[in-house]
Amino acid sequence: MSVHVLSVEVSVIKQFYALTKPRVIQLIVFCALIGMVLAVPGLPTWAELQLALLACLGIWLVAGAAAAFNCVVEKSIDAKMKRTAWRPTARGELADWQTLLFSAVLCAAGSILLYFWVNPLTMWLTFATFIGYAVVYTVILKPLTPQNIVIGGASGAMPPVLGWAAMAGDVGPEALILFLIIFLWTPPHFWALALYRVEDYRKSGLPMLPVTHGNEFTRLMVLLYTFILFAACLMPYVYGMSSWLYLIAAVVLNLGFCLYAFYLWRDYSDLLARKTFRFSLIHLSLLFAALLLDHYLL
């Protein structure tokens, strides 16, 4: 095999890998892992570790399938936006049939793995999440309503529920609390992004909130949602899922998020919107990391 042929094959593999939106999937699997950990009291057994690994792989495959499907549907939109113009589908480097076939293979492989080696409930919940994101959100909600992020956020909030179901075989109230936290976190996270990327969204024709309702209204919504999110993030402590370690982390992180949102509402700048968006990622990651530490240390 020539060096040129090998180089082309590696390039194609990288293109298919990019379709799965690796950074997004890392956060999805991390959130699913939190659900798995909290569903198991104490340290997991070797069998439980194996089950968790299989569940993570299955969820990763189906989530990657949903991301690839999204790339096909939104290729013309992606091509108009600086943030997404690099995607292989937007650049025309991969044909639609190739991407759809790739998506179907990933979805089938992940679903089979979850059904036979984890449990049927997790498979059906994961497949429902695939439909929720790939079809309900991407095809129906996103191009039609500025509330796309709010309603469509349900599919993005599912990972801890999937993780819990994988280990416990059911969906407990603890999993629903984690779902609620991510569900309420999603709008201010994406609206902060949309604020400083508003021209991209305007060119794309997507009815994001800053485009349809303006900058000032969107900033107010970001602020209000961070207040509601603050209350939701206290629920693991109130319900008895965690102790003082998580409580302290939740209070500090949510105060930080609320402060960013307040300053953004009071005196807007693209730089501050970008910082708010980045902090939202830190917020969720550290919040769940604190929940994980609390579970094992206290």
From Swiss-Prot:
Gene3D superfamilies: UbiA prenyltransferase
Record-level Gene Ontology MF annotations: protoheme IX farnesyltransferase activity
Protein's membrane topology: Multi-pass membrane protein
Pfam families from the UniProt entry: UbiA (PF01040)
The EC number(s) this enzyme carries: 2.5.1.141
Keywords, in A-Z order: Cell inner membrane, Cell membrane, Heme biosynthesis, Membrane, Transferase, Transmembrane, Transmembrane helix
Cellular component aspect of the GO annotation: plasma membrane
InterPro entries linked to this entry: Protohaem_IX_farnesylTrfase, UbiA_prenyltransferase, UbiA_prenylTrfase_CS, UbiA_sf
Transmembrane segments: 24-44, 49-69, 100-120, 121-141, 149-169, 175-195, 220-240, 244-264, 277-297
GO BP annotations, alphabetical order: heme O biosynthetic process
Family: Belongs to the UbiA prenyltransferase family. Protoheme IX farnesyltransferase subfamily.
Protein name: Protoheme IX farnesyltransferase
Taxonomic source organism: Albidiferax ferrireducens (strain ATCC BAA-621 / DSM 15236 / T118) (Rhodoferax ferrireducens)
